[in-house]
Curated annotation (Swiss-Prot):
Keyword Metal-binding: yes
Biased composition (Basic residues): 415-425
Designated name of the protein: ATP-dependent Clp protease ATP-binding subunit ClpX
GO cellular component, one term: HslUV protease complex
């Protein structure tokens, strides 16, 4: 009897449920504690349930594609197809991040985005506005400044440093950010066939970008510049960073046209002149083989599976850009003049003339501000000193001769500017 009692005392048992070793399949030992396989399974189920609850909460707070597009509509004029495609791609990207945080049989692959469109069509603005809406860190990099490691220029890791800096060095936040790489078409290799000489700013940069686009733990020098062995590095996982690469890809339309023309020869083929199909329409037909012929390497094309094309902006779209968005240029200049107690008016004909000048210069929306600055420079210089001006009218002639119509104030002097002084807080007042 005493022997049986001693055996019971010696037998190990689970510290959580109290079951003895012979009552369970396995007992795992720790420093002074034991846990059985049944308790391990129960703990695993609890953790999984809590993770799924967190994911459901994250999914409910994730804006839907229609909400993303609606926000983009407030700031970016036109490009409806591009905004829809971008909204869906970004929504799916953040869904993927949330899903991959739980144990699941299906692993969603990363989907970076390639934006193609003429200069000034809104590529950078779309990416900036998207990041602002999602409230995630955002960084812009210029592909033309990048070179292969070991050569004069920027390493690709410097792109990641910009994102870390914009996230105030919060690594976890940076790892869910968005990076926009502009002028990506400028790192196309110089010829379709691999060159004997080293292409350090073309194919070499594409090779350097492959790992961070796919997802890797990158070593980022905290002070930027070149890496050296005696400095500490910031470790950044790029798996959940969304990369959007943009470029004008001048000349790729000719490659698309040649391919589509060759594939539609023969009886019954549609005969179209160049005038019938603009560059924007041709870009919508782009295929990986066109990008390959342009100079992107196959591995790089594979890391950018989603292609979004933007069309060149016509005159009406440019006029809308001048007036419609929340931060429209016309609204900005009116506000500047209002701060001097001067009313600024743009005639419809003037807006059309400004838009036509931007088209003539082939600068798109990007060139609108410089055109307006040229028109307004002299009058903005005079207004603070000349108190007789109460209203400035910009008409069609002003766009060419830079002489706006000026309206004098009643009595020859406009009212003084009223500046509201901030009221002192009661807590700051002294007796």
């Amino acid at each position: 009897m005493d022997m049986a009692k001693n055996d019971d005392k010696k037998q190990l048992k689970c510290s959580f449920c109290g079951k003895k070793q012979d009552q369970v399949k396995r007992l795992v030992a720790g420093p002074g504690v034991y846990i059985c396989d049944e308790c391990i399974e129960l703990c695993s189920e609890i953790i999984t349930d809590e993770l799924e609850e967190d994911i459901n909460t994250d999914m409910s707070s994730l804006p839907k594609p229609s909400e993303i597009k609606s926000y983009l509509d407030d700031y970016v004029i036109g490009q409806d197809d591009a905004k829809k495609a971008l909204s869906v791609a970004v929504y799916n990207h953040y869904k993927r991040i949330n899903l991959n945080n739980v144990n699941d049989d299906v692993e969603l692959q990363k989907s970076n985005i390639l934006l193609l469109g003429p200069t000034g069509s809104g590529k950078t603005l779309l990416a900036q506005t998207m990041a602002k809406f999602l409230n995630v860190p955002f960084a812009i990099a210029d592909a033309t400044t990048l070179t292969e490691a070991g050569y004069v220029g920027e390493d690709v890791e410097n792109i990641l440093l910009k994102l870390i800096q914009n996230a105030d060095y919060d690594i976890e936040k940076a790892e869910r950010g968005i990076i926009y790489i502009d002028e990506i078409d400028k790192i196309a290799r110089k010829s379709e066939n691999p060159s004997i000489t080293r292409d350090v700013s073309g194919e070499g940069v594409q090779q350097s970008l492959l790992k961070i686009l796919e997802g890797t733990i990158a070593s980022v020098p905290p002070q930027g510049g070149r890496k050296h062995p005696h400095q500490e590095f910031i470790q950044l996982n790029t798996t959940n960073i969304l990369f959007i690469c943009g470029g004008a890809f001048d000349g790729v339309d000719k490659l698309i046209e040649r391919r589509t023309r060759n594939s539609s020869l023969g009886f019954g083929a549609d005969i179209k002149s160049k005038r019938d199909e603009n560059v924007g329409e041709l870009l919508k037909k782009i295929m990986p083989e066109d990008l390959l012929k342009f100079g992107l390497i196959p591995e790089f094309i594979g890391r950018l599976p989603i292609t979004v094309t933007l069309s060149a902006l016509d005159r009406d779209a440019l006029v809308e850009i001048l007036t419609e968005p929340k931060n429209a240029l016309v609204k900005q200049y009116k506000k500047l003049f209002e701060m001097d107690n001067v009313h600024l008016e743009f005639k419809e004909e003037a807006l059309k003339a400004i838009a036509e000048e931007a088209i003539r210069r082939s600068t798109g929306a990007r060139g609108l501000r410089s055109i307006i600055e040229e028109i307004m420079k002299d009058i903005m210089f005079e207004i603070p000193s000349d108190e007789s001006i109460s209203k400035v009218i910009i008409n069609e002639e002003t766009v060419s001769n830079k002489n706006p119509e000026l309206i004098e104030a009643e009595g020859g002097k406009r009212p003084p500017i009223k500046i509201k002084k901030p009221r002192a807080k009661k807590g700051n007042e002294t007796a």
